Amino acid sequence: GKVKDDKPAPPKRPLSAFFLFKQHNYDQVKKENPNAKITELTSMIAEKWKHVTEKEKKKYEGLQQEAKAKYEKDMQAYEKKYGKPEKVKKIKKSKKGSK
């Protein structure tokens, strides 16, 4: 079997400005559209994001920068203590082309 080490998971990557905006607006959009699917809600939020003022976008970009700085600091501390985290390889499913 695979030996599980006691290393904690490395810090999670910071969210993008759009994802922070999405998190911030999701409940409100859901409340306004209770029967919408998640994909529809995401589209609505994306549409809102397109029309957000530069000032508002800067707010989320600032939050993203803070999250990124924290992530980098946490990652340095993690690497100092545990070494670089192993990259998880994504397995690509090969599609057999039929010609």
Swiss-Prot record:
PROSITE patterns membership: HMG_BOX_2
Record's GO cellular component terms: chromosome; nucleus
Keywords noted in UniProt: Chromosome, DNA-binding, Nucleus, Phosphoprotein
Subcellular compartments: Nucleus; Chromosome
SMART domains: HMG
Post-translational note: Phosphorylated at two positions (Ser-16 and Thr-42 or Ser-43), each 6-7%.
DNA-binding interval(s): 11-79
GO MF, one example: DNA binding
SUPFAM superfamilies: HMG-box (SSF47095)
Residues modified as Phosphoserine: 16, 43
One Pfam family in the UniProt entry: HMG_box
Residues bearing PTM Phosphothreonine: 42
Gene3D superfamilies registered for this protein in UniProt: High mobility group box domain (1.10.30.10)
InterPro entries the UniProt entry points to: HMG_box_dom, HMG_box_dom_sf, HMGB
Protein name: High mobility group protein
